[in-house]
């Protein structure tokens, strides 16, 4: 990994809220992560880029405690997360919005929204504020989760973690399979959350989308970070990204 991991960005003076050092992870006997190092500062949007199978999702799940077999260090506000339960990590204000969205098809939008408990100490986002971010949801409260479009399901998945009170959000491929107009709306929402002081770790293959909102990037390949750089360096990294992402 290059020195760009610590390059000065607008959020560079902010405190580091998440620090991952030497993170290794396994699924059964399959060794997936091979010493991942990354950091996220308060109020930043940081994006993990990489092809399918690079280890991006496993990195998020390892931070959240979903992957059982791990080694290395993951600290959140200087508190070690490895060894803590998923519930305990969530109570610290950390939330994961999974790629598969995990919307319950037989429950209404309202039931899905209120299903996870308010668990973070920071206090939940009000439903009124959620509906200003996602006005479509306020019009579909009684609709079944399975009747929502892909974009509406993604909005509901993000809204659900906001209502828990989490302030550190991990979003896994939030634009996957969505129409361009919905992708733009998701981008505006992430930018608004950043303005409100949320810290976001984003997994994306669509670096053109990420370029509009991310402060810094970490590029993964074969379970390792191979490069890290600030948004301002993106034009000079295009050749590397084309090779690393296959686009």
How would you describe each model-predicted region?
Residues 2-247:
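Glycine-rich phosphate-binding loops of nucleotide-dependent enzymes
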């Amino acid at each position: 990994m290059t020195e760009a991991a610590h390059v000065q960005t607008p959020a560079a003076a902010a405190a580091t809220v998440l620090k991952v050092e030497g993170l290794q992870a396994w699924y059964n006997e399959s060794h997936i992560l091979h010493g991942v190092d990354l950091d996220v500062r308060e109020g930043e949007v940081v994006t993990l880029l990489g092809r399918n199978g690079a280890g991006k999702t496993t990195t998020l799940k390892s931070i959240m405690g979903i992957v059982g077999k791990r080694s290395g260090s993951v600290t959140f506000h200087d508190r070690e997360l490895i060894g803590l339960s998923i519930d305990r990590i969530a109570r610290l204000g950390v939330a994961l919005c999974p790629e598969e969205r995990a919307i319950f098809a037989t429950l209404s939008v309202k039931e899905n929204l209120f299903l996870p408990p308010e668990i973070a100490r920071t206090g939940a986002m009000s439903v009124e504020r959620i509906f200003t971010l996602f006005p479509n949801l306020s019009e579909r409260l009684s609709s079944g989760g399975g009747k929502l479009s892909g974009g509406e399901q993604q909005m509901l998945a993000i809204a659900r973690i906001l209502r828990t009170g989490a302030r550190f959000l991990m979003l896994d491929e939030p634009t996957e399979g969505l129409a361009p107009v919905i992708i733009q709306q998701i981008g505006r929402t992430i930018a608004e959350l950043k303005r409100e002081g949320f810290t976001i770790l984003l997994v994306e293959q669509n670096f053109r989308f990420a370029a509009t909102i991310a402060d810094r990037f970490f590029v993964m390949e074969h379970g390792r970070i191979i490069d890290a750089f600030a948004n301002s360096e993106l034009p000079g990294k295009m050749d590397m990204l084309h090779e690393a992402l296959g686009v």
